A protein has these predicted regions:
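Short basic helix-loop element that most often maps to the first helix and adjoining turn
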Residues: 20-37
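N-terminal flexible/basic segments that precede or flank functional cores
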Residues: 1-20, 94-96
Length: 97
């Protein structure tokens, strides 16, 4: 068997990976989206869109949400590329030789 990478468009975008870091952190801490949104000074709907990778947050919003989660921005910026790499590895499709 040969492994081939899925199409480049199948890789998560950075905004999706950042959103996943925020969502995972919030869930791990059993926090409600409305509470984190209030502390970050964004609407719950906007935070939900960021977490789902629908919105591309500015650096200021990333900082605000990170602060609301008591999560250093440097941790977010380290974890997000790792999540993209993990998804890339899982996107390899086996092909019969």
């Amino acid at each position: 068997m040969i492994a081939v990478a899925a199409a480049p468009g199948d890789r998560p975008l950075m905004r999706e990976a950042i959103g996943e870091v925020f969502r995972t952190t919030r869930h791990h801490r059993s926090e409600r989206i409305s509470d984190v949104a209030r502390r970050a000074n964004v609407s719950p709907q906007y935070l939900s869109e960021v977490e789902r990778g629908v919105k591309d947050p500015s650096s200021e919003i990333v900082e605000s949400i990170s602060t609301a989660l008591d999560l250093p921005v440097s941790d977010v910026l380290r974890q997000a590329p790792r999540r993209i790499d993990t998804h890339q590895v899982s996107n390899f499709l086996p092909v019969a030789a």
